[in-house]
Amino acid sequence: MAAAVLGQLGALWIHNLRSRGRLAWGVLPQSYVHTSASLDISRKWEKKNKIVYPPQLPGEPRRPAEIYHCRRQIKYSKDKMWYLAKLIRGMSIDQALAQLEFNDKKGAKIIKEVLLEAQDMAVRDHNVEFRSNLYIAESTSGRGQYLKRIRYHGRGRFGIMERVYCHYFVKLVEGPPPPPEPPKMAVAHAKEYIQQLRSRTIIHTL
């Protein structure tokens, strides 16, 4: 008796769903479907190429072109990639390619490929006249999506290891590279520290 009642209730529930509208996988929210790989990548870095600035006034200096490019899910450590990314930061595009050409690390070849792709993108999509008139304004690495795998041990035992991946991001700006900033001396650091102490305020007071 109870099974018959439950069967009738289930049939009524399905009938109500069908009367409201047919459900399809395409209209279900993405959170109900296992799409973790697609949800992790927001593509915010590449969207910066689509920023439209307001028109410039007559006589105003021309705004330099900015090119954002990246490569994701590189089979390489983010810490090893960071050292190479920091190496070319602030260099011209030709100088950076020359430095990476004579570096025997695996990440150097990857960064060189990304820089060449960004250089072609600058000429093709961003109206840059000279390929060499670019410098690396930003260059950094980020943590990718790690994958857990089984590491087999002796005597039938095992452990969990991670296959590491990283992202590499670069921003090219049209024009000559800016002069390097001189390193701060101890006196300058001390003055900044004293100024921070003097500018402190007492919270929850007038």
UniProtKB/Swiss-Prot annotation:
Coiled-coil stretches noted in the UniProt entry, renumbered to this chain: none
Any GO molecular function: structural constituent of ribosome
Statement: the UniProt record of this protein carries the keyword Membrane: no
Keywords, ordered alphabetically: Mitochondrion, Ribonucleoprotein, Ribosomal protein, Transit peptide
Residue pairs linked by disulfide bridges in the UniProt entry: none
Oligomeric and partner information: Component of the mitochondrial ribosome large subunit (39S) which comprises a 16S rRNA and about 50 distinct proteins.
Full protein name: Large ribosomal subunit protein uL22m
Lineage: Eukaryota, Metazoa, Chordata, Craniata, Vertebrata
Gene designation: MRPL22
